[in-house]
């Protein structure tokens, strides 16, 4: 199997518990790939972090870069293949460390990668994992965070956005602020209160479609 012209011979025969030599080989692969595939600068300089991404050019550039890194097996490295990953046990930490050291552009879908994906892998249904994980890794669908509120800030115990069950659906009412990546996202990690009498346990975690009617 080749990844952008670099051979990765250990991919097909990697053991479940990798040896030190396999880890070293993968680390060297990551270093070579990042060195040879470092993207050229954008015409419009990138902001310091993904919070500040506003230009369409920035989004396209960063989504293309993340997709390329995923194809090279630097993202979703240890996630099962049926969920859009590469199935290499214990290797994601190596890939992430080499990406940081290489000082290449950041991954725009950091909320999807750092919050949505880990949550789905532990708590998601099989259908949810197959539906949502692949486009998180490739940056085809960007995720934002819907936690903080105008009257509560980041104090989730004071969260007021309500969620009321209506048959098979939920009716959600409320407002969110400091919605990181909200302007460019397809989906939101949304916290809403389904039990107003239970401040600590009466909160539900929703996967909210940003294109849904009523989202403004």
Regions found by a protein language model. Name each.
Residues 168-169, 173-216:
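A short core secondary-structure module
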Residues 161-164:
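A structural signal for short hydrophobic beta-strand segments in well-ordered beta-sheet cores
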Residues 108-127, 153:
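N-terminal glycine-rich flavin-associated loop
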Residues 82, 148-152, 177-178:
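Short, solvent-exposed loop/turn elements at beta->coil junctions and helix N-caps
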Residues 2-110, 131-138:
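Amphipathic, small/basic residue-rich leader segments at the start of a protein or domain
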Residues 30-40, 94, 124-129, 167-173, ...:
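Long, well-ordered alpha-helical segments
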Residues 152-155, 170:
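Hydrophobic, small-residue-rich alpha-helical packing segments that form membrane-like cores
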């Amino acid at each position: 199997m080749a990844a952008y012209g670099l051979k990765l011979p250990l991919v097909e025969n990697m053991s479940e518990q990798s040896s030190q030599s396999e880890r070293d080989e993968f680390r060297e692969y990551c270093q070579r790939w990042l060195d040879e595939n470092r993207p050229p600068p954008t015409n419009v300089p990138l902001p310091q972090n993904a919070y500040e991404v506003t230009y369409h050019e920035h989004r396209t550039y960063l989504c293309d870069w993340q997709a390329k890194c995923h194809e090279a097996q630097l993202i979703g490295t240890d996630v099962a293949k049926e969920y859009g990953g590469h199935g290499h046990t214990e290797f994601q930490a190596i890939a992430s460390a080499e990406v940081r050291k290489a000082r290449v552009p950041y991954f725009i879908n950091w909320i999807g990668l750092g919050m949505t994906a880990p949550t789905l892998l532990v708590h998601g249904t099989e259908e949810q994992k197959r539906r949502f994980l692949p486009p998180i890794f490739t940056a085809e669908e960007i995720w934002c965070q819907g936690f903080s509120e105008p009257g509560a800030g980041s104090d989730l115990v004071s969260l007021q956005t309500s969620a009321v069950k209506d048959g098979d659906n939920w009716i959600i009412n409320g407002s969110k602020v400091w919605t990181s990546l909200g302007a460019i996202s397809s989906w939101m990690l949304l916290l809403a209160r389904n039990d107003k009498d239970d401040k600590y346990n009466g909160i539900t975690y929703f996967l909210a479609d940003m294109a849904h009617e009523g989202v403004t």
